[in-house]
Amino acid sequence: VSEQGAYWAIQTLRQLTERQGKRYSIQGCEITDWPAFRIRGFMQDVGRSYISMEELKREIEVLSRYKMNVFHWHLTENQAWRLESKIFPMLNDSCNMSRMPGKYYTIEEAKELVRFCKEHNVLLIPEVDMPGHSAAFIRAFRHDMQSKEGMAILKLLMDEVCEVFEEVPYLHIGTDEVKF
């Protein structure tokens, strides 16, 4: 039995618990339980619309109760780049965000959310969508991601993103709806 398996077993017991006044009970039963799918996830698009850390944590707690094990965090979109960049702070400048200007997650908040997910046995997978859905990048740099200049910037930027999420085994890069 793994720590994660024990955690999911507790969630099953929580789901079976009935409350009658101040008393809690579980009907006698036999449980055979395992996931139908290895990855049971949820994607939250904060690139288009910023969501507070408090709300994200509430969502992760609910996901965990229902044994969802992946939280896909879509951080960049045409509307905004929501992850703080120390090397390219213009990405987080209000004038480069077309929706909810000035709203982004600090590096410390991103690391905090990774830790919070781990505590709830949920894997956080950050996404930096590229090269499509990148109008916020273009507004900040005046270069398309696919240009020579854009690729040089992206290399540095992705190094920074990987440092922020060094405890996470995956980084999603989108790659949908690319225009050539």
Predicted regions and their residues:
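Feature activates predominantly on carbohydrate-active enzymes
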Residues: 1-172, 179
